[in-house]
A protein has these predicted regions:
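Non-heme Fe(II)-dependent double-stranded beta-helix
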Residues: 2-51, 56-155
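Short hydrophobic-aromatic micro-motifs
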Residues: 55-56, 168, 211-213
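Aromatic-acidic/polar surface patches that form glycan- and anion
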Residues: 61, 106, 159, 203-204, ...
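A short, structural micro-pattern
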Residues: 126, 160-162, 227-229
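A structural signal for short, well-ordered beta-strand segments
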Residues: 129-132, 166-168, 233-237
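Catalytic core of non-heme Fe(II) oxygenases with the double-stranded beta-helix
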Residues: 139-204, 242-252
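Conserved double-stranded beta-helix
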Residues: 189-212, 222-306
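Short, charged beta-turn/beta-strand-edge "cap" motif at the junction between a beta-strand
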Residues: 217-219
Length: 306
């Protein structure tokens, strides 16, 4: 089976003029870029609906990937290996990344990825988890699973994705170093069907690419048969009515969240859901915890893109 690659986003980037504003002469070019990105987003959405996943290459530059990797280095010391076979005894996981590595925010709120997620999740969805996964040499494959809980929520398959996941490659993903394996089309299977290894594909992709898929798709971390670790960042997004995997407003307290954009703050949970005022703090909007001057009520759809 062929891996689906929507497009290399890096070719769609434009350098801005002074003060971040595009020169008038670039307006037509910018319109073409916007149109190309719209096309890419629509293509990715179509691939996810049909096959369960999509890959966007060049979503971040190699320089940005290196910067994030460098900022992560103090937390990647081989001291937080998995506690069981599923987590991986040779896999290092670092949680609460937005409390530790601010650069990760650029992945969490990446506009192209959020536009894809927007098509599948309800308004005001939340960041459920954001972690680094570093697969060390001699790690064995995970069991196949779905991020929607693999039956834990008593929802029979097939069903629409309850959550959406992104896996950002901070190293090249190869067939030998623990690249994610995914089962195309498994989001359409009936409840009893389980994956066979022969039905999966290995998602090989270059540094800077991102795999986006529904929580209703079978996948797993692969075996690392090389001599070096393979690093990825994995943000997961979920509906506003469901408890987050990580308790984000404790993991990223107001004093830390204050440095981020309104968009990231809303994803963390410093936001309310409609209808009503679900998520309030003592009857007040939680954004007041990070911005005492906050005046109005905004939903994430009203916030500017990053």
């Amino acid at each position: 089976m062929k891996v689906l690659i929507c497009r290399d986003v890096s070719s769609l980037k434009l350098e801005s003029g002074n003060n971040g504003k595009f020169d008038l002469a670039l307006k037509d070019t910018k319109n073409k870029v916007d149109s190309s990105i719209d096309s890419l987003v629509n293509s990715a959405i179509g691939d996810i609906r049909e096959n369960g996943y999509a890959i966007v290459e060049g979503a971040i530059s190699s320089t940005m990937a290196s910067d994030i990797k460098r900022a992560l280095a103090p937390w990647l010391q081989g001291k937080q290996m998995g506690r069981n076979d599923f987590e991986g005894f040779r896999t290092e996981r670092v949680y609460a990344l937005l409390d530790k590595v601010p650069q990760v925010a650029s992945l969490v709120e990446h506009d192209v990825i959020l536009r894809i997620v927007d098509a599948f999740l309800p308004l005001n969805y939340l960041l459920s988890s954001a972690l680094a996964i570093n697969i060390y040499p001699d790690e064995t494959p995970q069991r196949f699973h779905m991020d929607d809980g693999d039956g834990a929520m008593n929802v029979r398959r097939p069903h629409p994705p309850i959550g959406m996941s992104a896996i950002w490659a901070l190293d090249d993903f190869t067939s030998e170093n623990g690249a994610t394996e995914i089962v195309p089309g498994s989001h359409k299977w009936d409840h009893e069907r389980q994956p066979d290894e022969r039905e999966s594909i290995t998602v090989t992709m270059p540094l800077g690419a991102v795999l986006v898929f529904g929580g209703n798709v079978f996948h797993r971390g692969g075996a690392n048969r090389t001599g070096i670790p393979r690093l990825a960042i994995t943000p997961q997004y979920g509906p506003p009515y469901m408890r987050q995997l990580e308790n984000m407003t404790l993991a990223v307290p107001p004093t830390v969240a204050a440095q981020y954009s309104e968009r990231v703050q809303a994803l963390l949970g410093y936001s309310v859901d409609s209808p009503g005022f679900r998520g309030h703090v003592n009857g007040r909007h939680p954004r007041l915890l990070v911005d005492p001057h906050y005046k109005g009520r905004k939903y994430r759809k009203d916030l500017p893109s990053s």
